UniProtKB/Swiss-Prot annotation:
Ribonucleoprotein in keyword set: no
Organism, as annotated: Staphylococcus epidermidis (strain ATCC 35984 / DSM 28319 / BCRC 17069 / CCUG 31568 / BM 3577 / RP62A)
Cofactor: Zn(2+)
Domain SprT-like intervals: 7-146
Biological process according to GO: response to stress
GO terms for MF: zinc ion binding
Protein family: Belongs to the SprT family.
Source organism phylogeny: Bacteria, Bacillati, Bacillota, Bacilli, Bacillales
Record-given protein name: Protein SprT-like
Binding site for Zn(2+): H67, H71
């Protein structure tokens, strides 16, 4: 599915589920890594993670579009468009937009660092580096040792 097909799909979803026209752009952004899509407040455009389509198909993209269109229409109407707002929760439930999408990578796949406590030998994996002088084992309070890095 290219950007043109994505645009027409979004316009049809907007009419079908929201009864309003989508008048801005929707496109794939390959730089999105940990999110399925995002609504940009300043330009009113919607960006979609192409990995979601590649891994999970059109159904996943439709769900992401519905979610982002909830942000879009509520923001343009001047209502609460954030996840915590009552208006957002009720609109997303009404149109069947899920709150989250399926992650493209698991935490284990994204982890770059592996640590082990020298006392109880509990292992910890982390995406970001940990300051070993400040951090201790959450289980026994022992000293952590870096085992391996992926970066």
């Amino acid at each position: 599915m290219n950007n043109l097909a994505l645009q027409s799909l979004t316009e049809s979803i907007a009419i079908k589920y929201f009864g309003k026209a989508f008048k801005h752009e929707v496109y794939y952004n390959k730089r999105l890594r940990t999110t399925g899509g995002r609504y940009i407040l300043s330009s009113h455009n919607i960006e979609i993670n192409p990995k979601q389509y590649e891994m999970f198909g059109e159904k996943a993209v439709i769900d992401i579009i519905k979610h982002e269109l909830c942000h879009y229409f509520l923001h343009l109407a001047g209502e609460g468009y954030q996840h915590r707002d009552k208006a957002f929760k009720s609109l997303s439930a009404k149109v069947g937009a899920p709150r989250f999408c399926t992650p493209t990578e698991s935490y284990q796949d994204r982890a770059n660092y592996k640590y082990r406590c020298i006392y109880c030998e509990q292992e910890f994996i982390r995406i970001k580096r940990v300051n070993l002088e400040k951090m201790r084992c959450g289980r026994c309070g022992g000293i952590l040792k870096l085992l391996q890095t992926r970066k």
